[in-house]
Amino acid sequence: MDNSKERLEVILDKLKEIEYGVAVIRSNEPQFPYTSGPRDYQIQAFENWKTNKQKGLFAMATGTGKTITSLNCLLEIYKRLGYYKALILVPTITLVDQWEKECAKFNFTNVIKVCSKYSGWQTSLANIRMLELTNPDNKQSYVIISTYASFIRPANFIELNQFPKNKLLFIADEAHNMGAGLIAKRLNDIKYSRRIGLSATPERQ
């Protein structure tokens, strides 16, 4: 994704806020960020995803709310279980920051950004991994946002591969990138029970 496309995504997000209406007054609880609630097609996307054993590809045009649609699925998980756990992969550092902002709109907290731009995330990941290993029934909520480049590095991959595959929602933005070389090989080694791919171009040439 080039810089011009990333800027377009930011502009479309701003227009989307206007279209949805005034944001919901914030509380400590995760919630949908707009008073109008999710659109019909976003509700249907969640229902289809749930029917398909919580697996699916959301192939949607730019500006139609792929990010909101996928985070709404995480919100529905929270409503049912009382906690949320997610690993989100994106192709660029700019999108790491953009996804963090979208998570904040839903009031998703404890966001860990895994990429070369930031430091300290190794300790945060290690602490959460230890909690998951020592207390598998914990209800600690967190969202890990990583670039594909950071995800496929051996040390990071080993760390992330120890997170609970049956409780964590895996979201791959620009999912057609997963068809590339080492990324595809790494993902073949991980079997997440809950998966969402996001793409405007699902067919890889």
Predicted segments — roles?
Residues 58, 143-146, 170:
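Hydrophobic positions in the central parallel beta-sheet of the AAA+
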Residues 94-125:
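Conserved helix-turn-beta segment of the N-terminal RecA-like "Helicase ATP-binding" lobe
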